[in-house]
Amino acid sequence: MNNYDVIIIGAGPGGIFGAYELIEKNPDCKIAVFEAGHELAKRKCPIDGKKIKSCISCKSCSIMSGFGGAGAFSDGKYNITNDFGGTLYEHIGKQPAIDLMEYVDEINMKYGGEGTKLYSTAGTKLKKVCMQNKLKLLDASVRHLGTDINYVVLENMYAHLKDKVDFYFDTPVESVEVLYDENTAGVDACSLQEAHTDNVSGYAVKTADSTYESRYCIISVGRSGSKWMEKVCNDLDIPTKSNRVDIGVRVELPALIFSHLTDELYESKIVYRTQLFEDNVRTFCMNPHGIVVNENTNGIVTVNGHSYEGADKQTENTNFALLVAKHFSEPFKDSNGYGESIARLSNMLGGGVIVQRFGDLVRGRRSNEKRIEEGLVTPTLSATPGDLSLVLPKRIMDGIIEMIYALDKIAPGTANDDTLLYGVEVKFYNMEVELNDKLESKYKGLYIIGDGSGVTHSLSHASASGVYVAREIEAER
């Protein structure tokens, strides 16, 4: 039997910052971190654009799992705001949430992010321009590390932690069991589970090879761990509620078209309300001079975007997502399944990601290689030319088209025929777990943080939740 003070499941942003803060507060704290994916240096996607051009569904996706989580190869944007990125503030308060995100920013600067720019919407005239065109610019400060610097920060944090924390890579956790004090012998399990009780003595974490015990357990499995998280909640009778799924496309166009926005703000979170259905369509994950990439979630290939801080890796294009949030009511509960079914349809029709010119979309015709090659925008991702209207539901497709025309008013050229749309992009959200103001479940000492909790949806919020829970644990100990 292996015993620890704290076991952390998942080495994404929440798990990393949780471990970091625990060690900062108490260097003698005995911590184990279990991660289903590889250590950072071994995270290599086999797609090279030559021999392997599309996803081969590796057992452990190096893009989505491993040290650093799904954010390891992202463009490293840390948005310091309560306006988007999660609802952490609903649990801990608005100012405490901002304070924690600013603390995370300080740590990132300490471990390799120094010199990167902090952008802000404060005082920008672009907010008025958006309002004049039925668009809303959300407030935020944005620290852009870039995919390259983000990786360096993770390397340095791992170097700091590896001798202080026991990391178990390529070690999926099979189950989490609640342990009770000996004085509860004879009390039936149902009675024990009815209350958030002091009778809990710790947790047993089981892998394929062994069992590990700890007084405290932090679960931080990210979005890719959504199905596993749902199973744990079902097994332990932890209440959850249905969340949402965001569905849309990734837009790629010449960087010059959005340069007046990206030069000042880097990333602008812009929201538009459609006229017919009053759905909210928003920009997401803007990557100036970036590239479009594949993403694998549960064996389904979707699209994403990256950008780099180093000038030698930058392109002439900017890309961003346009997403429509779909919230579901009873009796439907499987919002992620809905998103997966749409992504699977894209995979079936195109063998992966589909790309289409905006001009072809509005004319009701599929794109072909010839028209894309002759266009003004050179694709940064090898994708199958096709027709996205055969994949996306009409309501979502109409909303995206409306949004593109709205953006064209503040960034003329957005609605050019040669603007490229890649599909589909899906942002999956975990079922939101019922947690108290300590981010603690109904079981004392069992914390659920990061995107796996359904509470956070961003690097900054997930990282902040890890710091917060670490401080709660140390305050109690």
Regions inferred by a protein language model and the residue ranges of each:
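Residues forming the flavin
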Residues: 2-81, 122-124, 128-477
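Dinucleotide-binding Rossmann-like beta1-alpha1 core, especially the glycine-rich loop
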Residues: 66-116
